[in-house]
């Protein structure tokens, strides 16, 4: 009986260089779940290291334009880089949240947010300048404007008192009557002129006089104005109907003017 010895022969190695190349060549094994394990050997500074890498190849169907875009040649800092984003050159600096409020639904959302913000303000805060309840008088953005207006009122009061002895009480009575029919408008947008203000308040009643306080140097509105009606009833209706209405990017505040005496 003749015995046959089955010997699995290894690849023929003709030189030591081929032996080193075969030994250092990566060996790839694929598991049942599609994960491939690659084992390779590398030598650094005379020290031999074993490197094991696991990866999985996934085939994904994408639109043709996306596939063509991946073939574009990279340029600039990404020149010569392989396909796909690179950590060194591709990153998101910061996320920018945008809110579009051009349609009616967006305006309603903005109004609801403003109402919630107004509800959060405490009733203890009150500004004696603009009568607002969301800040103190020291933090009023129109504090300088009101102070200038108060100084102008004080100067006018002094002039009127000095003139009483010469002109009698007729001018003073006329001025008091005018103050009774005058509304003070604050939070006035700089884009609003006298004609627009007259058009808005003229729907309530007959307007006799409109005065918009302006800066002496720049000529820009200071943010408040005075509207005088022919009757006090029209002034009262203007305060009731036009107070807290939206005008451009501001909310108008309409109230009785402070008496000058």
From Swiss-Prot:
GO molecular function: RNA binding; translation initiation factor activity
InterPro entries reported in the protein's UniProt record: eIF3_g (IPR017334), eIF3g_N (IPR024675), eIF3G_RRM (IPR034240), Nucleotide-bd_a/b_plait_sf (IPR012677), RBD_domain_sf (IPR035979), RRM_dom (IPR000504)
Superkingdom, taxonomy of origin: Eukaryota
GO cellular component, one term: eukaryotic 48S preinitiation complex
Xref: Pfam families: eIF3g, RRM_1
Protein's UniProt keywords contain Protein biosynthesis: yes
Family: Belongs to the eIF-3 subunit G family.
GO BP terms, alphabetized: formation of cytoplasmic translation initiation complex
Subcellular location: Cytoplasm
Start-end of Basic and acidic residues biased regions: 168-180
Annotated region (Disordered), positions in chain: 156-180
The organism of origin for this protein: Caenorhabditis briggsae
Keyword Hydrolase annotated: no
Domain RRM residues, every copy: 181-259
Role of this protein: RNA-binding component of the eukaryotic translation initiation factor 3 (eIF-3) complex, which is involved in protein synthesis of a specialized repertoire of mRNAs and, together with other initiation factors, stimulates binding of mRNA and methionyl-tRNAi to the 40S ribosome. The eIF-3 complex specifically targets and initiates translation of a subset of mRNAs involved in cell proliferation. This subunit can bind 18S rRNA.
Lineage: Eukaryota, Metazoa, Ecdysozoa, Nematoda, Chromadorea
Keywords for the protein's UniProt record, in alphabetical order: Cytoplasm, Initiation factor, Protein biosynthesis, RNA-binding
Full protein name: Eukaryotic translation initiation factor 3 subunit G
Major localization listed first in the record, in broad terms: cytoplasm
Subunit relationships: Component of the eukaryotic translation initiation factor 3 (eIF-3) complex.
